[in-house]
């Protein structure tokens, strides 16, 4: 299985590839606070990214390379996110006694029950959640899948600029973690927040 979730890794750049631009962010941690060390953005040529899918990997790679020259960071590991119609996420239930490897094998065998694509076409990952509230001895498992091409094009674009994709996350979950981080830093109460709104150049998403 390919990693689609955020795994712990130090010194990563966050690179957001949208339909109209690329944004790069580098954070440093001081105590329990985070500080923006570098931030830069560049517009993308029309048609380089269409409906959140990279259509022209060379153009995207060139713009990321220009960002790399601009920010002059020594960090080469990067985190990117996938989203759109090529991403599938759902919660399934598996036997709680299974190890992660056994869960992986079972998901592969039963993949056609959860994913409407051939296994050859997708990258899959999963994350063990809480015990099932309905079925004793079962555990909820968050299953995520994305068209493999969508992942590989992002990896290729980063490599063209000299970066390595250490994390390929799902945009909605990356947004959730970013909100958690910001709410803790700004002393906000999550209970008072009813929605998160992402206002982009061509679309607005409400989480």
Segments the model singles out, each with a brief description of its role:
Residues 1-110, 152, 162-164:
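Non-catalytic, solvent-exposed interaction/assembly segments
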Residues 12, 140-142, 194:
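Short active-site oxyanion
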Residues 16, 79-83, 144-145, 197-200, ...:
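Short beta-strand segments
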Residues 21, 33, 136-140, 203:
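A generic structural signal for beta-strand entry/edge sites
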Residues 39-44, 48-49, 133, 182-207:
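Oxyanion-binding/catalytic loops of NTP- or PPi-dependent enzymes
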Residues 81-183:
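Active-site neighborhood for divalent-cation/phosphate handling
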